[in-house]
A protein has these predicted regions:
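Acidic/aromatic-lined carbohydrate-recognition and catalytic surfaces
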Residues: 1-184
Length: 184
């Protein structure tokens, strides 16, 4: 068992980039046919993979900055300007700040000059996964707008999913909702 975050990386934690592919190749060469991992969902307070916001969404910390460069959404220079991540432990605060920064850059680049193939893939994914993705993206956008507070501490109409309040949130937070979908 090895969680991808335990793979070697210069970017704070291991991700689903080149080192994950190398690990899978190693498993295959050793005759292994399975890679057992801990849950891969987005984590909240405490950063435990067993305490996730979603059964379906992926943890954005597992997005490889190098693959975003390959897709033309970031530059090598942008990911080279990473913080000095500690060795031997994870500084989740530093990681979140940096990952959120580069994911925002990648999203802006995607929105302003979308690659046709990437755009088509995104739209296909968003349509295919809308049964969970729409609510998840709304939840994350509202959580961000609420200062990352626990949903139990949100204003009563939001907490109780008042239809009119949620519709207003969908309109007011449209850009952030799309960003959350993009990160998936």
């Amino acid at each position: 068992m090895l969680h991808p975050t335990s793979l070697p990386s210069a970017y704070g934690v291991g991700d689903l980039g080149a080192n994950a592919y190398k690990f899978v190749d190693f498993l295959a060469s050793a005759g292994q046919t399975y890679w057992q991992v801990l849950p891969l969902g987005p984590t909240g307070y405490g950063d435990s993979p067993y305490q996730s916001f979603s059964a379906f969404a992926g943890n954005t910390n597992l997005i490889s900055p190098e693959l975003l460069v390959e897709d033309g959404l970031l530059t090598s220079e942008e990911i080279d300007q990473k913080p000095d991540f500690p060795v031997g432990r994870v500084d989740f605060g530093l990681l979140y700040d940096w990952k959120n920064h580069i994911l925002a850059l990648a999203f802006e680049r995607f929105r302003s000059a979308p690659n046709g193939e990437l755009r088509a893939g995104f739209e296909s994914f968003a349509e295919r996964e809308r049964s969970w993705l729409d609510d998840y993206a709304l939840f994350r956008a509202v959580k961000k707008a609420q200062g990352q507070k626990l949903w139990l501490e949100w204003e009563e109409p939001l907490k109780l999913r008042d239809a009119a309040v949620l519709e207003r949130a969908r309109e007011d937070l449209r850009g952030e909702i799309e960003a959350q979908k993009f990160q998936q």
